[in-house]
Each structure stands twice: as C-alpha cells, then as structure tokens.
C-alpha cells in the first residue's frame, strides 16, 4: 500500500459499521498516511471520537462550529489538505446529501469544498441500498467522478441478509489507493502470465520449477490499480488474486498455451512472466509409478513455445513483453530471446544475483528493447519493477 506522505480525510457517518472505520484509520496510519477524521454527530453515538484520535494521532472533528481549532476555517483547510477524501461508512442519508449538494454538517460541508478525489463506501440495510433513490444518488456521484466501493453481501446487524455490509479493510484500502493512483492504463487490456507450470508424471508426481508467481502477480495488481482490464493466467501458486484482476487458473504448459492464445487477440499488452516448463513427460502414467530396484528413465517431450507463438501472431499495435531467467550469459541469452521471439521488450534477471529470482520481494533486472537500447535499474521491489515495466510499455504504445 502506497500512502506515505498522503493526507487522507476520513469521514465517518452514523451507521453501525462506524466501528469498522477504526481499523481503517489504524491501517492507513500504519502505512504512512496522515489521517484526519471527520464525524457526523450520529457517528459519535456509535463510536467515540477519542478512538480515532488515539489511532490517527490527530483530533477528530465533529462540530462544524467547534471553536477549539486554530484560526483557519477548518472545513476549508481540511478540504485543501486532502489528497483523498473518504466517506466510510457512507449512510443513505449522507449519500443523498452529497448527490444534492447539501452541506449541513462537518462532513458534507468539507466534501462540498474539496477538490480531492472522493471515495464513497456505502453501508446500510439492504432495502435502503437497493432503493431506487439510493441507486440514483450513487449513479449521480459516479457521474461526477466519485469512486464508489460496492458494499459486500452477508448478514447485517438488523438481522437481514443481503448487500449492504461495509467491505473488509483491505478492500477499502485498495479502493482508496486506486483513487490516489493515476488511471493512465484505463481502457487498456493487459494479459499477464505468472507462476510455474506442473507436468504430470503420474497421478502423484509432476515436473515443475521454483517460481512463486510474485513478479507476475505484482504486474497484474499494479496494472489493475492503474485502471487496466487485467487477465492473469496463473500456474499453481499460494498467492491471493490481486483485487480488480480476472484470474484464470491452469496447471500445465499446454493449458497455459490454450488459455493465453485464446485471449491474446483482444490484448493491448501481453506480459509473459510465468516460468513455463520447456518439457513434459512424453507419457503420463495412469497409476502411481512404483519404486523399483533400478533407475527410472523418463522420456521428455517439448512443450509448445507460448512466447514464440505470441510473437508470430502479434497484431499491429500490440506490445509483447517476455522474461528471461538465466544463470549464465544473461544479456547475450536475453538479447537472443528478444529477437527470436519477436518481443518488444524483455525483462532479464539472473538467479545468481542476491535479491533477485524466485521467492524474493525484490528483483534486479535489465530491460531490453527491440530498438536496441537497454535499461538497468538498481535493485527494487517487485511492485516498483512492475510499475516500471508498465511505464515503458505505456510509453511505447504512445509513440
């Protein structure tokens, strides 16, 4: 989460979900945000302002006419200070006020004055949420560029079940970060492959590699955060699907070949970060192979070359990025792969470099481009490298 140096004005309104805003405040603060909490008077009936003051380190403001603040007109100073303005939970009442420009408390008055992006997280009874008036008000806010985080479904405090629950904190954090992030990939379709493949020897054993999928998942997550429509074709991993990403699970290289090639034509960027097995057992035993006294010899067959097939079928305007993991002759091998596979860009890294490779949160990479130039950034997090890769692809797409 990227909140360091950002001022988040968090508005808490009067619903039972107000208590969940305490965890949101804590997580924002832990991730480096300056959190300024505004509350409606009804919100203060559900949870004490002191809770938010303790968690944020700042005074929580309830009364528009509180005379204990410094000389600035507080709702104006907070409106100007905000990098993002968040209403969570947002009741039907405050949504209606926001849609119609009513400013009769600290929350709605400051909202009317801010020029920051606004995030609204509705939380209310299902009937109130589904009411056409509420839905019309939400559409009005969407039309004005507000970021609406849809409520979750489940058991509600009133005893009903349905839509209306305030989403979990991680979903709220993602929505807030997205509002803070430039949507420069909006309208782009991006396909990312990630993780290992598994090639079955028998019903128990398989051939695979050490890939965890972290790099590909980082790329998919950052692309979605920046507004792209993202498809992630993933081999078996223990990673959670990044929010906003459509994940397609596969197991073998042939599965990945089919999943990728069937979707390739619609993509603007294809980023093939998966560690795909080059070979598979020529035959897969129907029963578990039993241990004998001698050696076990397994004949291997070549898997289809997904990157090469994408390079052949690449349509005009489509950009193809491959990856190369090497243990020797890194740049020579990477340059050869870039040319042979008709890539526009290739990300090369060495398993020998400390801080690079499988299972690390960082990477050390050289970016090679079809026009011959290279870029060698210093060690960075995989999320930062993901953004760099996307930046370069976006730059090429605009030429």
Describe these PLM feature segments:
Residues 1-120, 125-399:
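A cross-family phosphate/adenosyl-ligand binding-site feature
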């Amino acid at each position: 989460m990227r909140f360091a140096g950002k001022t988040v004005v968090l508005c808490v309104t009067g619903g039972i979900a107000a208590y969940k805003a305490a965890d949101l405040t804590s997580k924002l603060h832990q991730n480096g945000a300056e959190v300024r909490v505004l509350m409606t008077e009804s919100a203060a009936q559900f949870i004490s302002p002191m809770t938010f003051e303790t968690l944020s380190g700042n005074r929580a403001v309830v009364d528009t006419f509180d005379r204990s603040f410094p000389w600035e007109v507080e709702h104006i100073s907070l409106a100007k200070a905000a990098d993002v303005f968040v209403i969570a939970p947002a009741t039907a009442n405050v949504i209606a006020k926001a849609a119609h420009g009513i400013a009769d408390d600290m929350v709605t008055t400051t909202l009317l004055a801010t020029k920051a992006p606004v995030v609204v997280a509705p939380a209310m009874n299902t009937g109130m949420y589904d009411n056409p008036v509420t839905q019309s008000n939400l559409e009005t806010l969407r039309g004005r560029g507000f970021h609406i985080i849809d409520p979750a479904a489940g058991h509600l405090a009133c005893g009903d079940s349905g839509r209306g629950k305030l989403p979990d904190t991680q979903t709220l954090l993602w929505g807030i970060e997205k509002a803070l992030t430039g949507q420069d990939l909006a309208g782009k379709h991006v396909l990312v492959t990630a993780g290992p493949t598994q090639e079955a020897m028998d019903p128990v054993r398989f051939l695979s590699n050490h890939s965890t999928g972290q790099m590909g998942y980082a790329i998919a997550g950052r692309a979605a955060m920046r507004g792209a429509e993202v498809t992630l074709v993933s081999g078996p991993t223990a990673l959670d699907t990044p929010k906003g990403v459509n994940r397609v699970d596969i197991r073998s290289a042939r599965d990945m070949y089919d999943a990728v090639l069937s979707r390739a034509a619609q993509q603007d960027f294809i980023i093939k970060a998966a560690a795909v097995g080059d070979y598979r057992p020529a035959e897969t035993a129907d029963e578990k192979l039993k241990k004998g006294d001698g050696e076990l010899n397994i004949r291997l067959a070549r898997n289809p070359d997904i990157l090469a097939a994408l390079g052949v079928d690449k349509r005009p305007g489509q950009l193809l990025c491959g990856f190369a993991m090497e243990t020797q002759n890194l740049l020579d091998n990477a340059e050869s792969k870039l040319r042979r596979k008709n890539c526009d860009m290739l990300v090369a890294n060495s398993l020998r470099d400390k801080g690079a490779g499988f299972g690390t949160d960082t990477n050390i990479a050289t970016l090679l481009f079809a026009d011959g130039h290279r870029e060698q950034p210093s060690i960075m997090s995989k999320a930062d490298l993901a953004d760099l890769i996307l930046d370069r692809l976006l730059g090429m797409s605009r030429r």
